[in-house]
């Protein structure tokens, strides 16, 4: 079948084989013995309106668009009869709203047909589900070389030039994962599109080989950057992210053994020692005042100090030692939490990267202790403005353009949504942040909360221990080339050499099956002793990490089930193919375990044994391909001593005029993308599944994005899990220390506002830094880490988990082929989790009753540094607002006490955009006006737009005024009353007078068409 990257619609059918855009070889597409196409289309397709409008917005002259779902059934051992194919079509369609055809093209009015499918080896979840549907219906199993492939056919009508066709194809497909087949109407004719079956076909696998390291430093550095030279292809295999000191350590170790390392051993060490896995920057000594590294000095030390001070009141159960952190929920249950990042893969394939991120952190929950049940998902996206189209390219001469911010934004939203919705996990909590420095590499945060009993059958379920003699069992999906070098890839900046194989697509259906059987059955039957997920580094990391529990491992790599034949041993060992867990199963229980997995349709394979030899030994087809001391594997990487260089941060508070009226400014600020409604995300994410919904992502009749959500996770219990977060990237360049304090404070305040006590709150930290090899960036990192330490200790809120991603940079070219580097702003996400003692007393954000009193609780300063207001008027700099934490703590204790007593009708933390935006959101949420007067002594715009931390907007019933004001004293400031349909603020004269409806329109307009 022809393959080319340009096309002329008038000269014949064309496949845009995206694989041809890259120098690395890809498996090829070939025809099966029997191939049949089933085409399914809606009578009225609900997907088309939004897609058509989106394509037209790109300047594509579409008159009409039709969408057809394609299922290509490929078999070799048997063929299906026409009657059977018709039965399959009926199973794959809904007769009420859909029609299907078998081996007959769909008829419609169109000018060009564009079919988009997956490249060989890319996970095809829809195809896999269709295959299983057919197997269940007919009661037989597809064999090797047989499959069902899904694709989508777009029938486009309009005056489409080759340029507009190319633009449409680019909007429909991602060249890293998709193939495109285009035909004109004449070529489509009566036969339609071709039945393409993208099986993977690889050459015979190459045996593990020795790699000589007695090379010059220049040649060693090339191995570290580009990978091992493949003797068969003459190409480098992909980044190892090993520096010279690490390569010297590896060379010296194997010199001591009297042999050269194998490629399996070098690849394994690269995964284990990667920044992604070892967090070397946080672990390394820094300057003279941080000899133990930032992690031990700031994050771990803060948590240890807090836990020691709390004594018997400590809420922590497991911190920093397992896949997630855990706190006490009640006397019988624990809740776990972990937030991961999946930035580099999401830059290449936003949908697959985000989907893999969310199902991966789900596995961190399943892999905590002996298995927690995922009960809440969390998301966060930092991208460029979706309305911009930056001209950035990975190659010169405008080759290999980066994906647009909108493409990334829409892709990551879909990925996390599919992951949660298909897994039956609610996704109530999340946020978005936009900045032009995220155009080169987005930040994609994915988190999961889990719940589990504290003990079962006399065992503490948060404890696990693989023992010598236990069998190593892999469950879930099979291993393929997807995800190879994922850990090392994410340990570097994105550049033109970033590997295609690092892209993965998760399979939530497969994961849901083994998740349920592990958490609901195998765990409580005591069928295994330890469990962890196959994430970064694949088997090389999961097995080797568990081997520390027993003291060694012996792996038979040729037993690992593969997606297709032909993979080399090193590829099998480090592949990050998704939906896999590794378990330690006692030999006497293996029969019961395997029988249970079979009955639940979960593939499970014994791939070796845990030992106490102190070594990680891996065999392939009877040959030892890896034999390394565990001590060297895990702790042999050389220590670093990092140096920082202080950054000048003296930014004066800017001087600029204040408008006489602030009406237009209010509406414009409400429409800023970091402030406005993102309800379209919340409506796509199921946040009520599992039945624990208390406070969801939007609140009030006006449906405003909330700062915190609340979910019941144990049936029958009135306790709930609250989630919130804090993030201030624009503060980082000005004052990273205060930035960290502000993020911690906002994360805590979100929970305080719904009634969760401060002593029931724990934190998670996610550092996403840039250019971490630059001393100036390390100084900012150091200041932020010390802010994390001081803020957590002062508030008494321990860290239970965290993650750092240190190279969030893009290196490429602009439209004129000039080298360009785009680095994200130093970004710290603080996530908060807290236990609400009684969800029936929780308070929502929306103003509720005519005549209620509106207050601001806390003190307002004049600082505007890094604020949304200054960003809106185009001014950088200023002073980041400080926080008196001791005063804030006292205020927060009063807040939760007042909420518990029913003195507060609504509460909302002041955050991005300042007091005015918080007041406006509370009013919009309640669809009720306010008549407010601001105090004198401060310029109106500074008072209303300052983002001073530690504050809340609250409404109080007049009957509770006396008790409320006695509780807070001079810490609460009466602003006015709730009522009417107009939002009015005065300061001796009218500053703002706007209908609530106009404010709601402005707030919801930016993403109204999504």
Regions found by a protein language model. Give the residues of each.
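Short amphipathic alpha-helices in soluble, non-transmembrane regions
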Residues: 51-55, 83-93, 129-133, 164-173, ...
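Interaction-mediating elements
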Residues: 62-67, 115, 131, 136-157, ...
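Short, solvent-exposed interaction modules
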Residues: 95-148
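Aromatic (phenylalanine/tyrosine) cluster motif
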Residues: 7, 22, 28-30
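Glycine/proline-enriched, intrinsically flexible loops and inter-domain linkers
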Residues: 62, 121-123, 143-145, 151, ...
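Short glycine-/aliphatic-rich beta-strand segments at the starts of folded cytosolic domains
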Residues: 32-43, 67-72, 110-120, 151-154, ...
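Short, surface-exposed ligand-recognition loops at beta-strand->loop->(often short) alpha-helix junctions
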Residues: 39-47, 78, 116-126, 159-160, ...
């Amino acid at each position: 079948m022809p393959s080319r990257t340009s096309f002329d619609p008038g000269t014949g059918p064309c496949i845009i084989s995206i694989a041809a855009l890259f120098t690395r070889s890809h498996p090829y597409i070939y025809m099966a013995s029997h191939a049949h196409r089933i085409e399914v289309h809606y009578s009225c397709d609900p997907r088309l309106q939004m897609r058509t409008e989106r394509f037209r917005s790109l300047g594509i002259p579409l008159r009409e668009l039709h969408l057809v779902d394609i299922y290509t059934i490929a078999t070799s051992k048997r063929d299906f009869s026409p009657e059977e194919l018709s039965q399959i079509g009926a199973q794959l369609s809904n007769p009420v709203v859909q029609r299907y055809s078998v081996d007959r093209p769909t008829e419609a009015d169109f000018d060009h047909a564009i079919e988009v499918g997956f490249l060989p080896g890319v996970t095809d979840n829809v195809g896999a589900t269709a295959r299983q549907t057919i197997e269940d219906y007919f009661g037989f199993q597809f064999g090797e070389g047989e499959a069902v492939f899904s694709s989508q056919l777009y029938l486009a009508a309009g005056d489409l030039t080759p340029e507009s066709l190319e633009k449409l194809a680019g909007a429909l497909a991602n060249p890293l994962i998709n193939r495109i087949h285009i035909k004109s109407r004449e070529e489509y004719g009566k036969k339609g599109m071709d039945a393409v079956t993208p099986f993977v076909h690889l050459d015979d696998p190459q045996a593990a080989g020795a790699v000589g390291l007695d090379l010059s430093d220049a040649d060693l550095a090339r191995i570290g950057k580009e990978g091992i030279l493949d003797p068969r292809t003459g190409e480098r295999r992909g980044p190892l992210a090993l520096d010279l000191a690490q390569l010297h350590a590896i060379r010296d170790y194997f010199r001591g053994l009297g042999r050269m390392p194998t490629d399996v051993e070098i690849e394994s060490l690269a995964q284990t020692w990667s920044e992604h896995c070892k967090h070397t920057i946080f672990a390394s000594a820094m300057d003279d005042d941080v000899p133990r590294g930032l992690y031990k000095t700031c994050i771990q030390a803060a948590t240890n100090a807090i836990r020691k001070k709390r004594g018997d009141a400590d809420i922590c159960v497991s911190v920093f030692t397992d896949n997630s952190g855990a706190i006490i929920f009640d006397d019988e249950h624990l809740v776990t939490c972990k937030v991961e990042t999946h930035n580099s893969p999401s830059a290449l394939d936003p949908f697959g990267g985000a989907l893999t991120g969310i199902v991966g952190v789900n596995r961190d929950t399943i892999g905590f202790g002996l298995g927690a049940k995922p009960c809440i998902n969390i998301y966060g996206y930092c991208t460029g403005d979706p309305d911009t189209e930056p001209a950035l390219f990975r190659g010169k001469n405008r080759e290999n353009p980066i994906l647009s911010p909108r493409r990334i934004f829409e892709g990551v939203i879909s990925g996390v949504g599919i992951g949660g919705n298909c897994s039956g996990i609610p996704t109530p909590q999340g946020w978005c942040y936009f900045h032009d420095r995220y155009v080169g590499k987005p930040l994609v945060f994915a988190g999961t909360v889990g719940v589990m009993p504290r003990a079962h059958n006399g065992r503490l379920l948060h404890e696990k221990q693989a023992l010598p003699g236990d069998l190593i069992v892999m469950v879930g999906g099979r291993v393929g080339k997807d995800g190879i070098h994922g850990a090392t890839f994410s340990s570097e900046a994105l550049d033109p050499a970033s590997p295609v194989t690092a892209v993965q697509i998760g399979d939530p259906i497969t994961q849901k099956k083994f998740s349920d059987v592990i958490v609901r059955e195998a765990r409580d039957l005591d069928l295994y002793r330890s469990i962890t997920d196959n994430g970064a580094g694949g088997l090389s990391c999961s097995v080797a990490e568990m081997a520390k529990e027993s003291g060694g491992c012996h792996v038979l790599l040729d037993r690992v089930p593969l997606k297709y034949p032909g993979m080399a041993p090193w590829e099998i060992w480090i592949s990050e193919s998704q939906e896999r867990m590794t378990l330690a199963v006692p030999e006497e229980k293996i029969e019961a375990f395997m029988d249970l997995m079979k009955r639940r349709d979960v593939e499970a394979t014994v791939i070796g044994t845990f030992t106490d030899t102190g070594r990680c030994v891996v065999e392939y087809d009877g040959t030892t391909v890896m034999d390394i001391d565990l001590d060297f594997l895990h702790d042999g990487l050389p220590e670093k001593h990092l140096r920082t260089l202080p950054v000048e941060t003296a930014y004066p508070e800017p001087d600029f005029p204040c408008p006489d009226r602030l009406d237009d400014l209010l509406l414009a600020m409400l429409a800023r993308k970091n402030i406005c409604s993102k309800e379209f995300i919340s409506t796509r994410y199921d946040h009520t599944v599992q039945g624990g919904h208390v406070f969801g992502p939007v609140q009030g009749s006006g449906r405003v994005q909330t700062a915190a959500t609340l979910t019941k996770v144990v049936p029958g219990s009135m306790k709930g899990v609250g989630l919130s977060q804090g993030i201030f990237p624009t503060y980082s360049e000005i004052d990273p220390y205060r930035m960290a304090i502000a993020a911690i404070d906002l994360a805590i305040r979100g929970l305080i506002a719904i009634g969760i006590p401060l002593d029931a709150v724990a934190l998670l930290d996610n550092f996403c830094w840039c250019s971490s090899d630059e001393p100036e960036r390390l100084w900012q990192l150091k200041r932020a880490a010390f802010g994390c330490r001081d803020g957590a200790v002062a508030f008494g809120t321990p860290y239970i988990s965290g993650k750092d991603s240190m190279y969030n940079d893009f290196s490429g070219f602009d439209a004129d082929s000039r080298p360009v580097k785009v680095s994200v702003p130093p970004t710290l996400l603080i996530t908060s989790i807290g236990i609400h003692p009684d969800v029936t007393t929780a308070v929502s954000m929306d103003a509720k009753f005519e005549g209620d009193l509106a207050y601001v609780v806390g003190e307002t300063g004049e600082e505007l540094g890094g604020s949304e207001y200054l960003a809106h008027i185009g001014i950088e700099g200023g002073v980041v607002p400080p926080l008196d934490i001791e005063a804030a703590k006292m205020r927060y204790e009063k807040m939760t006490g007042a909420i518990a007593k029913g003195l507060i009708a609504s509460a909302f933390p002041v955050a991005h955009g300042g007091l005015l935006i918080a007041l406006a959101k509370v009013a919009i949420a309640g669809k009720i006006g306010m008549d407010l007067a601001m105090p004198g002594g401060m310029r109106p715009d500074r008072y209303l737009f300052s983002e001073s931390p530690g504050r809340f907007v609250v409404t109080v019933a007049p009957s509770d005024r006396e008790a409320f004001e006695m509780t807070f004293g001079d810490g609460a400031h009466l602003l006015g009353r709730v009522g009417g349909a107009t939002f009015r603020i005065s300061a001796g004269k009218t500053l703002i007078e706007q209908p609530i409806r106009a404010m709601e329109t402005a707030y919801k307009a930016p993403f109204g068409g999504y």
